[in-house]
């Protein structure tokens, strides 16, 4: 089956499901997590690995218009990303990592050992984006990238991890109408501009940009501090209240 028809079939299967249809209720032992360090850690781990949550919006403000302006100004510096995997119009540029044009994981390239991840030359050209990232609740960064999906572009059906579970953070710098992120058993992600979401990239997913504008997101890999753990717990509590209310 060729790639397009495979995606079409996948989209039809996704559209049979609401995004949060199959999330799990919070276990009773985590009810008193607030103010309890160990419970906060345990509850956040449960959310990431066992809640069956496809994406979780965190309450982190984003200067989306400033970041979008910097990204679009530097769009000529973006390179094709994973274009040998059936993707089309998928571009990327690294602001923190090995180098601006090294958009895959370090072991994709021919390094003998993991190189230093640091601010790239692109960071100097995107000072507002860098300043926001420096205030982000993260203990350290690995790869931080701009991701662009051009008008008419497609991110082919794939998954990034073998196991389900919330993992990387995806930030919607913009998200044009008619650009949809389809997820296995979870419909589409209800993106709004400025959303910061933990994403389950162990699910099969695909993105199709049927708009006339480039879709600009950021993907953040790093070490999360306690603020991210607390945000995870607070966000899942709020999601649960909305989803399981009777």
Residues covered by each model-derived region:
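Non-heme Fe(II)/2-oxoglutarate
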Residues: 2-135
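A short glycine-rich, His/Asp/Glu-containing loop-to-beta-strand
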Residues: 131-151
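Conserved short histidine dyad/triad with adjacent acidic residue
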Residues: 145-163
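A short hydrophobic beta-strand segment most commonly corresponding to one strand
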Residues: 167-173, 196-198, 212-230
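A short beta-strand-loop-beta hairpin characteristic of the jelly-roll/cupin
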Residues: 172-193
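Conserved metal-binding segment of the jelly-roll/cupin
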Residues: 189-205
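Asparagine-centered strand-capping/turn motif at beta-strand->loop junctions
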Residues: 206-211
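Long, compositionally biased interface segments
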Residues: 220, 226-246
